[in-house]
UniProtKB/Swiss-Prot annotation:
This is Sulfate adenylyltransferase. SUPFAM superfamilies: Nucleotidylyl transferase (SSF52374), P-loop containing nucleoside triphosphate hydrolases (SSF52540), PUA domain-like (SSF88697). The record marks F330 as: Induces change in substrate recognition on ATP binding. Pathway: Sulfur metabolism; hydrogen sulfide biosynthesis; sulfite from sulfate: step 1/3. The active site is at T198, R199, N200.
Length: 574
């Protein structure tokens, strides 16, 4: 029999509200609407299907404060992660939202009405408190960056009436709701289920540790990977799911099933581990594996871990009785070549030879085409990963040139385009500052906001082209550090490679060699908001290459860029 849900009752709002579907659908058309973001959609789906039981909506201020401060809802139920609906003042004003009013929650992807929320309260969160208490306070933490840079200024709390499930077009048969997974376990006759959470591909070590956990508890295995939002830079879920499917036959017959979880991870370490355990309990699991640095985001810029390696295990152990799911703590397993087996590291006798491949080394082997041994991963899994991780010399990249007007950016860009075309092997696209302004951003001015929007557009185009294997050369002024960092993030998150080249030609030289007289017009006040005259240029703090046309020729600068690309493996050396 499956584990009882958290709070005692599975809050399957879709099943509960199905008899009123037509009535709610008609009402939703007449109400103001909040169009949900991707993260909000992930949260809503798990509220509606019971994955976040005992929640029945987005948290009001009482629950939010209690979760942040006490790791439990206002009614006393253990819950570790704030589940909130953030909105802007403009949305509140447009919808005339207030406590007691009803509002439709709508999918941004297809404009479908998903639910109606009855507003309990609208409140301004204490983001500093949330950042400190929930995530630890390090401003480099991805969830804290998201909180400060993406989350709107107000939260809307209230209960939900469900109308429609989210539409998915990928791996539909594997997207079990908690109720469906519980029925599936009953059909299979499974009474004890060990759930395994992952956002990465699985290899032999993962297979070994899950089988060990199941055998020790006379249980079966639920492979339950996250396919919602994970950490930027993670391998896409399409590739991962194909790899999980390829791995499944390697388990003893009938031992494991694969189900997908559309969760938006926060990378919240100890808090997230508790949350993950609650979610798996709601899906019917009786046991949950928590490993080293569970759901941690890695290291900050100083090379420091955001959380201790076993903080997550300590957190779930602290609340073990309340969680109502047995937590399986595991040590990292390692390969013993002399006996061709895997063992937990704490069980390996001193002096015995072991082998491991780190995630960084694996990515490097995929990038370079170096062999990946069978003791580490199965050939069918490696084949899938290689298909989605082509060698570096076939990948696209973006060269992002930034500097003052007339610093030589465009001359470098044109010369680099010719050189790369001569090199061959990939298409080359040129995004000159003036061309982009004319073709993509003609309606924009030169305010800080408009400049940022212009760079966002360049980054979007560059990311799409780079992902498709093209070489992109962009040469906007891009005076602001925030915009340049956002451009780097956009391209890398699209799966591309990004190089920032600071064309650090001094302002005096740019002005002296300005044959068009644009600087002179700016000095006379005929042009406002001109970079270097009455608007600042923020020197890049993390340029991949710094060049100067007042001291170097364009030819030598292009050669430096080519050498940088060659060193990084972007040209075929065979």
């Amino acid at each position: 029999m499956a584990n009882p849900p958290h709070g005692g009752v599975l809050k399957d709002l879709l099943a509960r509200d199905a008899p009123r579907h037509d009535e709610l659908e008609m009402e939703a058309e007449k109400l103001p609407a909040i169009v949900l973001t991707e993260r909000q959609l992930c949260d809503l789906e798990l509220i509606m299907n019971g994955g976040f039981s005992p929640l029945e909506g987005f948290m009001n201020q009482k629950d939010y404060d209690s979760v942040c401060e006490n790791v439990r809802l206002a009614d006393g139920n253990l819950f570790s992660m704030p589940i909130t609906l953030d909105v802007s003042q403009a949305v509140i004003d447009e919808g005339k939202l207030k406590p007691g009013s009803r509002v439709t929650l709508r999918d941004f992807r297809d404009d479908r009405n998903l639910a109606i929320l009855t507003i309990d309260d609208i409140y301004r969160p204490d983001k500093a408190k949330e950042a400190k208490l929930v995530f630890g306070g390090d401003e480099e933490h991805p969830a804290i960056k998201y909180l400060y840079n993406k989350v709107q200024e107000f939260y809307v709390g209230g209960k939900i009436e469900a109308i429609n499930k989210l539409n998915h077009y990928d791996y539909v048969a594997l997207r079990y709701t908690p109720a469906e997974l519980r029925v599936h376990f009953d059909k299979l006759g499974w009474n004890r289920v060990v759930a395994f959470q992952t956002r990465n591909p699985m290899h032999r070590a993962h297979r070994e540790l899950t089988v060990r956990a199941a055998r020790a508890r006379q249980a079966n295995v639920l492979i339950h990977p996250v396919v919602g939002l994970t950490k930027p830079g993670d391998i896409d879920h399409f590739t991962r799911v194909r790899a999980y499917q390829a791995l499944l036959p390697r388990y003893p017959n009938g031992m494991a099933v694969l189900g997908l979880l559309g969760l938006a991870m926060r990378m919240g370490g100890p808090r997230e581990a508790i949350w993950h355990a609650i979610i798996r309990k709601n899906h019917g699991a009786t046991h949950f594996i928590v490993g080293r640095d569970h759901a941690g985001p890695g290291k900050n810029s100083k090379g420091q871990e955001f959380y201790g390696p076993y903080d997550a295990q300590h957190a779930v152990e602290k609340y073990r009785e309340e969680l109502g799911i047995e937590v399986v703590e595991f040590q990292q397993v390692t390969y013993l070549p002399d006996t061709d087996e895997y063992k937990p590291k704490d069980e390996v006798p001193p002096g015995v030879k072991t082998l491991d491949i780190s995630g960084t080394e694996l990515r490097n082997r995929l990038r370079t085409g170096a062999p990946i041994p069978e003791w580490f991963s199965y050939p069918e899994v490696v084949k899938i990963l290689r298909e989605s991780s082509p060698p570096r010399h076939t990948q696209g990249f973006t060269i992002f040139l930034t500097g003052y007007m007339n610093s030589g950016k465009d001359a470098i860009a044109r010369a680099l385009q010719v050189t790369l075309n001569q090199q061959g092997g990939r298409s080359v696209s040129l995004l000159l500052g003036d061309t982009v302004r004319h073709e993509l951003s003609s309606e924009l001015g030169f305010s800080r906001e408009d400049r940022h929007t212009n760079i966002q557009r360049i980054a979007f185009v560059a990311g799409e082209l780079t992902r498709a294997g093209a070489a992109v050369i962009a040469s906007p002024i891009a005076p602001y550090e925030e915009s340049r960092n956002a451009a780097r993030d956009a391209v890398t998150q699209a799966g591309g490679n990004f190089f920032l080249v600071h064309v650090a030609t001094p302002l005096e030289y740019c002005e002296k060699t300005d044959k068009r007289g644009i600087y002179a017009k700016a000095r006379r006040g005929e042009i406002k908001g001109f970079t270097g005259v009455d608007d600042p240029y923020e020197t890049p703090s993390k340029a991949d290459l710094t060049v100067d046309v007042s001291k170097q020729t364009v030819r030598s600068i292009v050669h430096e860029i080519i050498l940088m690309l060659e060193t990084e493996g972007f040209f075929d050396r065979s």
